[in-house]
Amino acid sequence: MPDEGKVTIFVTSGPETPQRCATPFYMANIAAAMDNEAEMIFQIDGVLLMKKGVADDLFAKEGGKSIMDFIRDAKEADVEMKVCSAALQLHDMTEDDLIEECDGVVGAA
């Protein structure tokens, strides 16, 4: 039986499709506001959103909030954000490349 009150959102879009990057954070924040335990798992190109320096200058909409602002909002809402170990390898990244808002690495790769 699935965990009641827990929501997991998988993020696969990255900087190459910025218009898709804000929505997962909205969904996670809504889930957290509804008293659910919310977590986000960043896979494939989504892992790049957790790379230092990437989200600061990335915008889903011109003149809107940066993706880093969405990441900070999620942190304030106690959303847990983790990256897939295979996605780290795919992008030649290590844990040292990750922003401090990232809660760790999951997976067996």
Task: List each language-model region with its residue ranges.
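Basic/polar N-terminal segments that are highly enriched at the extreme N-terminus
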Residues: M1-E4
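Short, glycine-rich nucleotide/cofactor-binding loops
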Residues: T8-A22, V54-A55
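Short, conserved beta-strand edge motifs with alternating hydrophobic and charged residues
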Residues: T8-V11, E39-Q43, M50
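Histidine-anchored nucleotide/phosphate-binding helix
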Residues: C21-M40
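N-terminal beta-loop-helix "entrance" segment that forms/cooperates
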Residues: G46-A60
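A glycine-rich helix N-cap at a beta->alpha junction
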Residues: D57-S85, L90
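C-terminal binding/interaction regions
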Residues: T94, E100-A109
